[in-house]
């Protein structure tokens, strides 16, 4: 997808969220984190779990399908609406987690809930405990412990791109899929999980968006 199209979509989602849910103070960089991991598709496709999906990884619900049967058009405006609603729902759920203490972790919790669902996220017990310690004291050591716990999961082996982008956000404070040499620089002598090392030391071309994303 071209940069201009990407910016237009992110801008539209940001505007909708900031207009309808200004109290959440969801930034464009948070929306970009979701977008950079998920990509965007203007057409319906079937995801790896068999769900009909469109836009920013929006899985069609029974209600969505009923509305489509009644004539709902899958134009850009509708896809932006779904994306905004999905992001807001996940961020709201992120803030209800007992391990949530500061907004520094909100995009990470939010995206994981967006991707895994509330129940799926609840299974990441050790990661959530490590995230709590990281929020209480944002040191490199605590950051590594948190990322190692996230890396120690089947999810991390399936979506190394997501692990890489989240790691960049935690360690750099920026949303990017770039090469992450800081992991080795910061944590020499530390035990880096193989999944985390694999995700952060791959060349960027390895992490191209799936072909169905346009």
Language-model segments: which ranges?
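Charged, low-complexity intrinsically disordered segments
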Residues: 99-126
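Aromatic-anchored, charged helix-turn/loop surface patch used as a conserved interaction hotspot
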Residues: 62, 68-100
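Long, amphipathic alpha-helical surface segments
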Residues: 1-21, 29, 37-40, 74, ...
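Residues that flank catalytic or metal-binding motifs in active/ligand-binding sites
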Residues: 30, 48-50, 105
């Amino acid at each position: 997808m071209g940069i201009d199209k990407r910016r237009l979509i992110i801008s539209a989602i940001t505007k909708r969220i900031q207009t309808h849910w200004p109290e959440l103070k969801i930034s464009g960089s948070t929306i970009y984190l979701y977008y950079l991991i998920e990509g965007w598709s203007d057409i319906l496709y079937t995801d790896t779990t068999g769900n009909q999906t469109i836009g920013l990884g929006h899985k069609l619900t029974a209600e969505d399908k009923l509305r489509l049967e009644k004539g709902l058009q899958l134009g850009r405006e509708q896809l932006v609406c779904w994306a905004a609603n999905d992001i807001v729902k996940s961020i709201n759920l992120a803030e209800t987690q007992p391990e949530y203490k500061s907004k520094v972790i909100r995009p990470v919790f939010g995206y994981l809930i967006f991707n895994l669902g509330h129940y799926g996220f609840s299974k990441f017990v050790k990661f959530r405990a490590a995230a709590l310690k990281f929020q209480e004291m944002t040191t490199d050591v605590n950051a590594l412990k948190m990322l190692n716990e996230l890396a120690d999961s089947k999810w991390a082996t399936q979506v190394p791109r997501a692990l890489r982008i989240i790691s960049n956000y935690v360690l750099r404070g920026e949303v990017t899929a770039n090469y992450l040499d800081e992991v080795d620089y910061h944590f020499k002598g530390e035990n880096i999980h193989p999944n985390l090392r694999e995700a952060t030391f791959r060349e960027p071309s390895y992490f191209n968006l799936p072909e169905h994303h346009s």
